[in-house]
Each structure stands twice: as structure tokens, then as C-alpha cells.
């Protein structure tokens, strides 16, 4: 299928093009400000589907709203009258189309123009009124508060919040792209007779700001945010996409001694924490037990043995472990345990524990295996 994307260099256009080229065999024609007239005409006359994303939202003069959102669409439709395949057309409109302002009025005029075209020429059309959008590749300091806040917070720049209680209606760009793909396949999401993008979020500005600062702090205290809330999951992915390319990595605190090292990697309030333990050859670590704290050990490099003994018994249980055969070993409560490096190289063990370490209540009691 030949798909034309106008506004292909914009926020949604870049995400849509990246997805379509990665997941489909469609031939994509990109139309943008640098596209020559003959290239535009050639693409539109070959089109099986047109995704019209091009538009204007922050011009210097109000009259540019009409030029960008109505006149350009009219020009595209004029060319499409000569496309005998009658391609379906998807228009990105805005929830502001119902509002009395130059931008909203131009969007409404564009909708009316497309409907009239469909009635006259018989093309299938999909008109989507999108709310505020967020996601990767959205231009900061322009038209998106989330993009601007992500960019600034990731760079330790000050942000301005005039009213924390302002509620935003939002769609995530991946949901937009998924819906466009459904429309291309002829299976759009229709609610009350209107094409709709699922997963509309209503979130206050204050909630967004608080989450973004938590995400920033999480790199310092080695925590992971809760990701069971879809909006928070999408916002976290968005925030990370605005990290400076020189700031992808961050240091961990390595506790190093002559036995090796122990380093906390990730901590969560409800799923425990993950650490990396490195033991030098011949070293034994552990010899303690827990009442409630439980662990999982996974040796990923080297070889060794994990020994257990019930604190009320003399029997010693051994599990031989190796990075050549990845196996998880559960560490039950009430068993004293240790881990010994039996190899000639460092042994690396991933350790999960069911709770974050609390120095005031470590639940760890020394006892030789």
C-alpha cells in the first residue's frame, strides 16, 4: 500500500513513519515543508491512503492558521481529485475545533472541507479530534508542556507552573500511531459514531510535575517508579527520551572490600530490590539467616556453591551454580546460607530480595552454615 504522510517531519509524523517502516511493508511517501510541488503531486496521485498531519498551531500571524490548516488541505484535496483510486484520508484535527479561537476555527473549517470533499468524490475519511499529545520526539519549548518540562527537568533547568490544578486531556503518541494504523487497515476505533483514540488521560499539571521530579530522583536513589498505571508508564518512557545524550549513564555505589563487591542496582517500594554481588576466587559470603526477608540468587558468571542449613537442624544442603547454566536459587526464610566461589575467576551473582534494605530493621542474623 502506498501511504502519504503530510507533516512527516513533525512529532506524530516522525513516530508514525518510524513505526510503519519497522512493522509493515507499506511504501511511505513523506511530505514536509521541503517537499517540491511535483513531488507532492506525484505522491498523492500514487496514494492508497493519506495521513494528513500537516498544519499550523503557533504562527506569528493569525491568518497563517487558515493558510496552514485550510488552504493547504484544500490544495492536497485538489490534487487527489485526479487520483482514481480514491484513497482514504485521515485528518488530524483538534479538540479545540469546538472553541472560539483562530486555531480552533481553522481546524473546524478543515473538517468541513474534508467532509464536503468526501460527499462529492466518495473517498472514505477519518477525522480525529486529538487532545494534547505527548511522547518521544515532541519539540520542547514550543507547543507541549510535557515536552518542555521533560527537557528542562532532565537538564536541571527551572520550570514555571502557574496553576498546579489545571487539568490536561492527553493522548500518548504510541496510541495515536496505533489508531492511525487501525484506520489504514480499515478498522478504526469508533465511539458514538466518531473516530477516537483509546486511552485518553486526564491529569493535572501538578501531578505531571511531581511524577517528572520523581523520575529524575529515581536515578539518584536507584529506585524504579511504579509502572502499573498506564499514564505513568508512558510518561516515564517519555521523560527518558529527553535525557541529554551525554547523560544516559549514572553511577552506582559499589561497596568494595578484599572479598569483592556488593552493589545495589534497583530498588522498588513494593517489589523488593536487585543487587550485583561479585566474589573473588575462594571467597565465601553470607552465613546468616532471615525471619521474613527472602532472596533469589542467580549466578551469571563464574561457578560456585550455595549452601543451606535449617537453623534447627544439622543437615547441610548444597546447590552448585554456574554462569554456564543459569538457574535461580530461592533463599527460604529460617535457613542460614552462604555462597562460595569455587572458580578461578570472579563470580558474579544477581541477587533479588523482597524488600528494600532497612538499616533499622535488617532482619539478618549471623549463623555459620
Where in this protein do the model-derived segments appear?
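N-terminal Rossmann NAD(P)H-binding glycine-rich loop of SDR-like oxidoreductase domains
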Residues: 3-19
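NAD(P)H-binding glycine-rich loop region in Rossmannoid oxidoreductase-like domains
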Residues: 35-75, 79-83, 96-100
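Conserved Rossmann-fold NAD(P)-dependent oxidoreductase catalytic core, especially the SDR/UDP-sugar
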Residues: 74-111, 118-121, 126-128
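Conserved beta-loop-beta element that borders a ligand/cofactor-binding pocket
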Residues: 112-137, 147-151, 157-166
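Substrate-positioning beta->alpha
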Residues: 140-148, 162-185, 206-210
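Mid/C-terminal beta-alpha module of Rossmann-like enzyme folds, strongest
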Residues: 182-254
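A short glycine-rich, His/Asp/Glu-containing loop-to-beta-strand
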Residues: 248-287, 293
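Double-stranded beta-helix
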Residues: 313-315, 342-369
Amino acid at each position: 500500500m502506498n501511504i502519504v504522510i503530510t507533516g512527516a517531519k513533525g512529532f506524530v509524523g516522525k513516530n508514525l513513519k518510524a513505526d510503519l517502516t519497522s512493522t509493515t511493508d507499506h511504501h511511505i511517501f513523506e511530505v514536509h515543508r521541503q517537499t517540491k510541488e511535483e513531488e507532492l503531486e506525484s505522491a498523492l496521485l500514487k496514494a492508497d491512503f493519506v495521513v494528513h498531519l500537516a498544519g499550523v498551531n503557533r504562527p506569528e500571524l493569525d491568518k497563517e492558521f487558515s493558510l496552514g490548516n485550510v488552504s493547504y488541505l484544500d490544495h492536497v484535496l485538489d490534487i487527489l481529485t485526479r487520483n482514481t483510486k480514491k484513497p482514504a484520508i485521515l485528518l488530524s484535527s483538534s479538540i479545540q475545533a469546538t472553541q472560539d479561537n483562530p486555531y480552533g476555527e481553522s481546524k473546524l473549517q478543515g473538517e468541513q472541507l474534508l467532509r464536503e470533499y468526501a460527499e462529492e468524490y466518495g473517498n472514505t475519511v477519518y477525522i480525529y479530534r486529538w487532545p494534547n499529545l505527548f511522547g518521544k520526539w515532541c519539540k520542547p519549548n514550543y507547543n507541549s508542556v510535557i515536552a518542555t518540562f521533560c527537557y528542562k527537568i532532565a537538564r536541571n533547568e527551572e520550570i514555571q507552573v502557574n496553576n498546579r490544578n489545571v487539568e490536561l486531556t492527553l493522548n500518548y503518541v504510541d496510541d495515536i500511531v496505533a489508531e492511525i494504523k487501525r484506520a489504514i487497515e480499515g478498522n478504526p476505533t469508533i465511539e458514538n459514531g466518531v473516530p477516537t483514540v483509546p486511552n485518553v488521560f486526564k491529569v493535572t499539571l501538578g501531578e505531571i510535575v511531581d511524577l517528572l521530579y520523581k523520575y529524575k530522583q529515581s536515578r539518584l536513589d536507584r529506585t524504579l517508579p511504579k509502572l502499573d498505571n498506564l499514564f505513568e508508564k508512558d510518561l516515564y518512557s517519555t521523560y527518558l527520551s529527553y535525557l541529554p545524550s551525554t547523560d544516559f549513564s549514572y553511577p552506582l555505589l559499589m561497596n568494595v572490600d578484599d572479598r569483592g563487591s556488593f552493589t545495589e542496582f534497583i530498588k522498588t517500594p513494593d517489589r523488593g530490590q536487585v543487587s550485583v554481588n561479585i566474589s573473588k576466587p575462594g571467597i565465601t559470603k553470607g552465613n546468616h539467616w532471615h525471619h521474613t526477608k527472602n532472596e533469589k540468587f542467580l549466578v551469571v558468571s563464574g561457578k560456585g556453591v550455595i549452601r543451606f542449613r535449617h537453623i534447627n537442624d544439622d543437615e547441610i544442603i548444597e546447590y552448585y551454580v554456574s554462569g554456564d547454566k543459569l538457574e535461580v536459587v530461592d533463599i527460604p526464610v529460617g535457613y542460614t546460607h552462604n555462597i562460595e566461589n569455587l572458580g578461578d575467576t570472579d563470580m558474579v551473582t544477581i541477587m533479588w530480595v523482597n524488600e528494600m534494605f532497612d538499616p533499622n530493621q535488617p532482619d539478618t542474623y549471623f549463623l555459620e552454615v
